[in-house]
Amino acid sequence: MSDGHNRVHDFYREVLDILHEGKIPILIGGAFAQEYFTGITRDTKDLDVFLREADLARALAALGAAGYRTEIKFSHWLGKTHDNQSEQFVDIIFNSGNGLCKVDDIWFDNAPCGTAFGRPVKFCPVEETIWQKAFIMERERYDGADIAHLLHAQSEKLDWQRLLQRFDRHWRVLLSYITLYGYIYPTERSRIPPWVERGLLRLSASEIGRDEQGPPVCAGTFLSRAQFQIDVDLWGYRDIRTPELMTSQEVRRWTDAAEEEQK
């Protein structure tokens, strides 16, 4: 193992130890949770730590007191702490980029235990992992393969009722991934409980040919922070994220960051 790789893992351990010593409850997500649930290992540029928004200030203060640079990158969902000896960082996540998937007590109540970097940890539950990943459909990133692999590995253990409750009125997004799962794994379609798929298809059938009433609204901004901006800016659709989940200023900062990353 290279010295650089050792330093990365040392940094991760230091962050975990600081948060543990500060009695700040956290969950591990991202690539490390994906590996825990599916066995699929991949290189990753960072560590994703999830916590309740109420614990964010304490977490950043503890890391800052230990000498690490910290920041609130986006006020509606993301903080960061940076290693002083490398370009490595840890994402500190308390919501999703679209404002929908807030980390709450249910995440912690259902978090499985494991180890990471030689430390006992809890991982984000598979249900909440699927829920959060389902809304990532950017041009440069799409988590559909992750969801297919999670369904393939964990479908028989999933709390499907809780997953349905998480998606709630966004059930069409879940149905889209279940449909794709049946396409990706045609010989293992039965892993998805028939009552789940039939229930979602009944909902879909009940809406065929029916428009929602009211001013035109675009829910595409829940899926991509940039690709549906034209609908809002030029075509007269209301951005469904505001003002309930994000302020207009948070939306603009989040969208501008996407444009900057593409340069």
Which residues does each predicted region cover?
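Catalytic metal-binding acidic patch
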Residues: G30, E35-L63, P125, I147
